Amino acid sequence: MEDQYEKKITWTIKNFSFVQSQAIDSDIFVVGDSKWHLVAYPKGNGESTNKCLSLYLNVADFQSLPNGWKRHIKYRLTVVNQMSEKLSEQEVIQGWFYKNFHISGFQTMLPLSKLLDKNGGFLVNGDVKIVVEVGVLEVVGKSDVLEETLLVHESIDINGFQVLPSQVESVNNLFEKHPDIVSEFRSKNPLMRTTYLNDLLCLTEILCESSEELSTGDMANAYSTLTCLKKAGFKLDWLEKKLKEVCEARVQEIDEEWKDLTDLKENWSSDDEDDLNRL
């Protein structure tokens, strides 16, 4: 079920064929009250070495987790076929993560012969795209990760949200411009409220950037974050409109770039023909 996934992240591994490390990590992301990241073995792991891409979901900073911590997680891993989404390789798993069992995934996510096929659609312009969707089904024990973050800095309460001093101006502006933004938001968990608000602040900051600086992966993550926030009860019609405008502007820029390349190609072809006629 789609609503079981709270967060969707796209991870693009650049120059995949030239990666020398045995294992590589994605950026850290927050789901629920805990930090996570993906771990990929480009040349495979264990019995799958030199045979398959191995891919795992791992709890970041698991050493700092308190005893008794465990999370029931459902997640979906997808190696994206960039030529046809229908051909993407996908695996779904559901289970418990513990302090001492903090990593889970697939040793045989995708055969390397299929992944590295130049015409296969998984490796395009040297890049491999991986999508992870994660949902928290059950929580046992507290996570100190976000609590420690809040304790390190003095926090200020704004409309029931714990806000860092550096965020006060942005949050106040947000509530002044959109006073009904949290009128239907019902979560009482302070850590969850902080997580959602941080996601919202990041999203508004991203959409203030030039559309030229946003990749298709950035826009896909933005849409995913927006969807999660709306499901949680945030009223974000204004932000959805802004995101559509940014995406449309980016599409227009890509079209113009493509037209410039096409014109350049035609000019080259014309110059080559003139050179031949002179011979």
From Swiss-Prot:
SUPFAM superfamilies: TRAF domain-like. Pfam families: MATH_2. Keywords: Coiled coil. Residues 235-271 form a coiled coil. Residues 6-134 form the MATH domain. InterPro entries: MATH-CC_domain_protein, MATH/TRAF_dom, TRAF-like. This is MATH domain and coiled-coil domain-containing protein At1g31390. It comes from Arabidopsis thaliana (Mouse-ear cress).
